[in-house]
Amino acid sequence: MPSMFYRFVVLVLALTAWSFADTKKPASKPAGGAPDKAHLQKIWDGWGTLDPSNVAEYYATGPHTFFDIAPLKYASWDEYKAGVVKELADYKAAKFTVNDDAEIHPAGQYAWVTATVKEDMTQKSGKREMGNFRWTAVFEKQNGRWVIVHEHVSAPMQ
């Protein structure tokens, strides 16, 4: 009987050691990936050119709602692009930086992100505007690319 007990103890110890040795870290990204902070920064680098055509590839076409600081809303990328050109017409330079508080929440073929974005903009008159604003975006994977299907940009009331 002692040899049976000895075998049992050895078996339990071996299984325990094997279970600890076979631990693997879970993948840091879900299958299919999600936009990452570098991707988010590319979008804002495009906006820094003050030319919406430089960010068009990041936005879905069709009837989607985009909320920017002004006006109240846009119902499609075409409306957004046309409206933003007017809003940016008074500026000669801009730089946007996605802050370290960016959060990316993957959910299958969708992902939603939140971040604050640092702005440094110079008007054609020379007046400089600096601050931070809030950004929330919903991405959808379309044809292998992550595109924004809903966006909200806002500044805190002062």
Located regions from the model:
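Bacterial N-terminal signal peptides
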Residues: 7-17
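Short beta-strand segments enriched in hydrophobic/aromatic residues
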Residues: 59-60, 117-119, 152-155
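A solvent-exposed, acidic/Ser-Thr-rich amphipathic alpha-helical stretch
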Residues: 34, 52-107, 129-130
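A short hydrophobic beta-strand element
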Residues: 108-119
